[in-house]
Structures are given as C-alpha cells and as structure tokens.
Swiss-Prot record:
Name this polypeptide is given: Translational regulator CsrA
Similarity field: Belongs to the CsrA/RsmA family.
Assembly and binders: Homodimer; the beta-strands of each monomer intercalate to form a hydrophobic core, while the alpha-helices form wings that extend away from the core.
Keyword field contains RNA-binding: yes
Superkingdom field: Bacteria
Molecular function via GO: mRNA 5'-UTR binding
Protein task: A translational regulator that binds mRNA to regulate translation initiation and/or mRNA stability. Usually binds in the 5'-UTR at or near the Shine-Dalgarno sequence preventing ribosome-binding, thus repressing translation. Its main target seems to be the major flagellin gene, while its function is anatagonized by FliW.
Compartments, record wording: Cytoplasm
Keyword Repressor: yes
Species for this entry: Clostridium acetobutylicum (strain ATCC 824 / DSM 792 / JCM 1419 / IAM 19013 / LMG 5710 / NBRC 13948 / NRRL B-527 / VKM B-1787 / 2291 / W)
Pfam families found in the cross-reference section: CsrA
InterPro entries assigned: CsrA (IPR003751), CsrA_sf (IPR036107)
Phylogenetic classification of the source organism: Bacteria, Bacillati, Bacillota, Clostridia, Eubacteriales
Length: 73
C-alpha cells in the first residue's frame, strides 16, 4: 500500500486518466474529487462491500429456490 500526504488543492494521478484532488479537509474527514473516465466504476468501500454481500445472499437464495423447483418434479 502506498501512503501519500497531500494538501488541499493538491492531486494524485492513477495511471494516465484518473486524477484525485483534495477538495477540503477538516478534523474528521477529507473531501476528494475524482476525475476518471465514465467506464471506470467508483464506489465507496462500504457500499461495495454491501453490494458484494447482497449478491452473495442472492446467489444462495436463488440456488435454494432452484433446488426446491427441481425437487417438486
């Protein structure tokens, strides 16, 4: 993991086409702006983890329903 220090208004580049700029800082949070191509998905980690967990649950429920349908024949 790379750890970098940045001040308000400063940026970092990821590859050639993603730029992250520090917009504001306060005691408990950092506000960033992300400039990236539309095809790049950007999610907060907690949202990504929630979606991932919901997808796992959906697969389990779908397989349970499929088993029930198969057994009813």
């Amino acid at each position: 993991m790379l750890v970098m220090g940045r001040k308000k208004g400063e940026s970092i580049l990821i590859g050639d086409d993603i730029e992250i700029t520090i917009v504001s800082l306060d005691e408990n949070s950092v506000k960033i702006a992300i400039n990236a191509p539309r095809e790049v998905t950007i999610l907060r980690k907690e949202l990504y983890n929630k979606i991932k967990e919901e997808n796992k649950e959906a697969v389990i429920k779908s397989s349970e329903v499929l088993k029930e349908l198969t057994l009813k024949k």
